[in-house]
């Protein structure tokens, strides 16, 4: 009887949840040998094509940096935009394209945001449409995989770029 009561309470609790509440998110697969930080930028798109998001408040000593998700080397983590918003709404607000920036966590800890922005010290940037996200099944990989070769990105697929005496990718 106690088991039945517990099950009823659980079922009632689940049924009272708002079915129209959505969160937009994607899984980030870090297949590299370094820890990375992932940042979604959808509000700055109209300003400059290659703009690094202006997160002046990034604090490398804090585990809580709004807008950033850390992904350990050789692991996967979920990036979620909180709130009741659909993917379609996110892309509509972002003029149909979002940018996902991938940074080396050590770079974020070592350099000021001004230096990172000025030197464009990113590992990867994906410029994604909703169609791209659906094609990728909301999975983002670093480094890029063959599935992303036709996606707009910088540096381009399979291209190595040297920044501040360091070869990326």
Question: What do these predicted regions represent?
Answer:
Residues 1-17:
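Sec-dependent bacterial lipoprotein signal peptides
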Residues 26-32:
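Asparagine-centered strand-capping/turn motif at beta-strand->loop junctions
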Residues 33-38:
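Short acidic/proline- and small/hydrophobic-mixed sequence motifs that coincide with surface turns
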Residues 17-25, 39-169:
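Intrinsically disordered, low-complexity segments enriched in small/polar residues
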